[in-house]
Amino acid sequence: MKIKIGTRPSNLAVAQANMVASSLEAIGIDTEIVKHRSAGDIDTKNPIYSIGKTGVFVQDLNNMILRGEIDVAVHSAKDIPSEIENRLTIAATLKRGSFNDALVSKYDLRSLPISAKVGTSSIRRIFQLKYARQDLKFENIRGNIETRIAKMSELGLDAIVMAEAAIQRLGLNVEYSKLDENKFVPAPNQGIIAVVSKKEGTVRKILEEINDENTFEEMQIERSVVQQLKLGCSTPVGILSRPSGKGHKIIAQFFSMQGDDVSVFEQYLNDLSDVDSLVSYIRENIPREYGYIASEE
């Protein structure tokens, strides 16, 4: 049997697809990589939060599964909307890579010059950096990882922010410092490679053989918070679940839409079922003026 693996054409996306292909080939499954440009690849000028729709990097590939053009789609899990087409499912995750954000610069955060220019299109990252350094200036940059790094010199930027996992998976030789995940809580599911397939059929059963169960549970916990609070992919929120004892410690960081206030919630969870109590606590305690937390139905 050969499994057709759909991916975006960027070097990072292809590298991640190749990681999935290697895992499948290790259990005796032949694979073929199919590249396809998404809406998010085509519009590289506007910030993600201004495009006005969710799943800009994943919808086209998922539709290709439904049309039978590919068997699976490989995504960065953080790009997958909290709700996907009901005939599809996230069937597997590879072992989680680094979840940290990285400040790509010859400076670390403390030594960045006054009023330094930092490149990012993420509203979460902008607010986190502003909260740490109110003097910083920001420049919207989009495009693949290599393009963003090239724009540092083109735009005269002092730093850019990106996922450390991307740097590691591409084997890039760039100077960077890791940002503290307790202050710069990453996007939900950052560092996780997810594989989407049809809910029914042989392919899903095969994917279960390459699934990393610990990572899958972390993904479910973080996604459950997003789903229950009805958070959009462009809201200024960081969520991270990590193993702790026999359960998980979760940290959730919420910024007001103006970026001038932040609320942080930490809780120990035994398993996925404990997310309900965390979500209830967040609803009760987050300031109403944040405006994007859905009330309980």
UniProtKB/Swiss-Prot annotation:
Biological process according to GO: protoporphyrinogen IX biosynthetic process
Q: Which cysteines does the record link by disulfide bonds?
A: none
State the UniProt keywords alphabetically: Porphyrin biosynthesis, Transferase
Q: Which reaction does it catalyse?
A: 4 porphobilinogen + H2O = hydroxymethylbilane + 4 NH4(+)
Judged by the first EC level, this protein's enzyme class is transferase
Its name, as the record gives it, is Probable porphobilinogen deaminase
Species for this entry: Thermoplasma volcanium (strain ATCC 51530 / DSM 4299 / JCM 9571 / NBRC 15438 / GSS1)
Please describe what this protein does.
Answer: Tetrapolymerization of the monopyrrole PBG into the hydroxymethylbilane pre-uroporphyrinogen in several discrete steps.
What else the UniProt entry mentions is: The porphobilinogen subunits are added to the dipyrromethane group.
HAMAP family assigned to the protein according to its UniProt record, in alphabetical order: Porphobil_deam (MF_00260)
- Recorded superkingdom: Archaea
Gene3D superfamilies assigned: Periplasmic binding protein-like II, Porphobilinogen deaminase, C-terminal domain
EC assignment: the record states: 2.5.1.61
Q: Which family does the record assign?
A: Belongs to the HMBS family.
Q: Name one Pfam family in it.
A: Porphobil_deam
Which of the residues bear the PTM S-(dipyrrolylmethanemethyl)cysteine?
233
Q: Provide GO CC annotations from the record.
A: cytoplasm
Record note on cofactor: Binds 1 dipyrromethane group covalently.
Q: Which InterPro entries match?
A: HemC, Porphobilin_deaminase_cofac_BS, Porphobilin_deaminase_N, Porphobilinogen_deaminase_C_sf
What cofactor requirement does the entry state?
dipyrromethane
